[in-house]
């Protein structure tokens, strides 16, 4: 058991990052989608994420904590290489936090400025996260094609977050805003599909180890269902979004859950490409892990904290299910 602790922590880290991508992904996407010329719709969009967004970001804190304590060597390397985009991401998240609270107190003629700040912060956070994923996947190589891949990754992540953000709004809103959200999500979905296809082709090209894992026989046969299910789900989600609005909101939950499935399969493919490496092409989980004694002690905290966050997340989403209503701090 002790010898497998690094791999167990790597799986926990992957799960935590996935939860962050889904939960904070949709509220970042909603932030990007804030319309410029409709205050009422902006208010309703912000209200749709208001009860959840602080809890959603908890998963990012947990992921960084696991990386720092369980894999300190990898933590040092990753954040040394990604110092600038990490700083920009933190600035963007601070912008979002400040704008979110201040817009609730601001006078009407100042609300537009805070909404713009929230939108810019959301977009900057998404682009930096996508760029960091791209740099990480290629093992921080400095070749021009590696940086181009990181830029492609940033655009793909932005499309994916808008995709899930639009699907969330379809679930949580109604009327004209719901119809607009479905239209936004459909457009972003096809951009995300193009991005997934591009990354799936480019990643094996820039990383021979990934190409060998995916295209060797019989692995290529066993793994073929993953991309097939992803693109089939994109088609199904698009079909549901095209039907919005529906009678009695029938089926409006399925686009969001469909996009979550797409995210999950994409993460599964990424995990298969690199496991058990924690930094692709540089170090494995075993090489980067803390001592077994440290991992055992940390495990006590993880066993307490992760279920608590899961239960709290379930509780919040259970309490605030249904359509978004006005959000106020007054």
Predicted region positions:
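Long, contiguous internal "core" modules enriched in hydrophobic/ aromatic residues
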Residues: 102-248, 255, 269
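Membrane-interface helix-loop-helix modules in multi-pass inner-membrane proteins
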Residues: 50-123, 136-141, 214-221
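N-terminal signal-anchor module of multipass membrane proteins
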Residues: 1-55, 61-64
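Hydrophobic alpha-helical membrane-insertion segments
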Residues: 257-269
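Extramembrane terminal tails and long inter-domain/linker segments of multi-pass membrane proteins
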Residues: 1-6, 33-37, 41-50, 104, ...
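Alpha-helical transmembrane segments
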Residues: 9-20, 77-91, 145-160, 219-227, ...
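Short, membrane-exposed interhelical loops at transmembrane-helix boundaries
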Residues: 279-298
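Transmembrane alpha-helical segments of integral membrane proteins
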Residues: 98-104, 235, 272-285
């Amino acid at each position: 058991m002790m010898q497998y602790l690094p791999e167990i922590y790597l799986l926990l880290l992957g799960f935590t990052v996935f939860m962050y991508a889904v939960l904070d992904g949709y509220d970042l996407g909603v932030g990007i989608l804030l319309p410029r010329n409709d205050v009422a719709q902006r208010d309703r969009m912000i209200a749709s994420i208001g009860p959840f967004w602080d809890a959603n970001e908890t998963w990012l804190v947990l992921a960084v904590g696991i990386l720092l304590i369980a894999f300190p060597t990898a933590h040092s390397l990753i954040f040394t290489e990604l110092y600038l985009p990490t700083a920009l991401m933190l600035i963007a998240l601070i912008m979002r936090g400040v704008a979110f609270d201040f817009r609730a107190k601001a006078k009407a003629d100042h609300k537009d400025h805070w909404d713009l700040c929230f939108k810019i912060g959301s977009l900057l956070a998404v682009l930096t996260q996508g760029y960091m994923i791209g740099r990480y996947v290629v093992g921080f190589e400095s070749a021009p094609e590696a940086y181009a891949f990181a830029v492609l990754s940033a655009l793909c992540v932005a499309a994916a977050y808008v995709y899930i953000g639009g699907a969330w709004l379809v679930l949580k809103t109604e009327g004209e805003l719901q119809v607009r959200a479905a239209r936004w999500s459909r457009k972003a979905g096809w951009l995300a599909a193009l991005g997934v296809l591009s990354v799936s082709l480019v990643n094996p090209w820039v990383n021979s180890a990934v190409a060998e894992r995916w295209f060797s026989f019989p692995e290529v046969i066993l793994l073929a269902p993953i991309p097939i299910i992803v693109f089939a789900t994109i088609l199904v989600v698009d079909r549901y979004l095209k039907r919005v609005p529906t009678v009695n909101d029938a089926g409006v939950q399925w686009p969001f859950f469909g996009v979550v499935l797409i995210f999950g399969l994409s993460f599964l493919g990424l995990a298969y490409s690199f496991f058990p490496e924690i930094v692709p092409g540089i170090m494995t989980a075993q090489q980067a892990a803390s001592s077994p004694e440290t991992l055992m002690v940390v495990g006590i905290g993880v066993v307490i904290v992760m279920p608590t966050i899961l239960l709290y997340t379930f509780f919040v989403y259970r309490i605030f299910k249904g359509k978004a209503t006005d959000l106020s701090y007054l």
